[in-house]
């Protein structure tokens, strides 16, 4: 049986997921789409989803599909995911699950009332081969982890990008993947601001350093530098009792040319994790065919949202160490 997939939001990521489902993955076909900008929906159908119908609302897409992808504007995610849960439809939601923690909590509560998992959150780094290998190395070879040094660098960001977006749009990936990497929970967060780059603007303090502490005492520093100019660069080094391990660089051809040795650095985030997107969506489709969800859960999205909210508060109080408090984990997510 071919799974009927509906996509809510056909901007860049929604359209790319439609291409992925129809041309790369197996077991599903995009059959319905919607977007607040009909031109986006028409371009998606014309380009990568010729068999899909364009519908007028998220609710219509949910009703017409076996499972849905929520790829719309972040502020719309909560209502659309809740509608999918109410309809009993498996739902893949791009981050953020909700723009604030209380919205993510409502999703967790709704899913709990259904009694089974229906939501997968789009934290694709858990599917990256490099992170998977790093997690295994941390688990088996380094001894207890003590520290993590990480960096998330973008060449540039648009003028509408503001200081809090460094948390909700950028750091959110580190918040999730480092929690997963350590199998640990955060207990505090702190933000400090180094000297600002001349390439930023009045509404954005860049770079930033976020300091996190976990329940097991691991100290984490994450550099967020979204106007670094030179490329899209993700770094992660784990320091354990017995040694250190680093996230591998993306595969690239090293060259010796013109009296120089080097290799290129990617400029686009989509290229850095392109294989991970394929694997995470195939995982979703496999579970959705059974009427459920796999991978990063609504609880993971909630935990990330709580931590992100505290980090934004810490931005407003530079240097202050603020507590991160998670409620008890429901049995559904044990």
From Swiss-Prot:
Per its UniProt record, what Pfam families does this chain match? GFO_IDH_MocA (PF01408), GFO_IDH_MocA_C (PF02894)
Q: Which UniProt keywords apply?
A: NAD, Oxidoreductase
Cystines in this chain: none
Protein's GO biological process: inositol catabolic process
The chemistry this enzyme catalyses reads:
myo-inositol + NAD(+) = scyllo-inosose + NADH + H(+)
**Keyword Oxidoreductase annotated:** yes
- What molecular functions are annotated in GO for this chain? inositol 2-dehydrogenase (NAD+) activity; nucleotide binding
* Keyword Phosphoprotein among record annotations: no
Q: How does it assemble?
A: Homotetramer.
Write down what this protein is called: Inositol 2-dehydrogenase
* Species in which this protein is naturally found: Cereibacter sphaeroides (strain ATCC 17029 / ATH 2.4.9) (Rhodobacter sphaeroides)
- Phylogenetic lineage: Bacteria, Pseudomonadati, Pseudomonadota, Alphaproteobacteria, Rhodobacterales
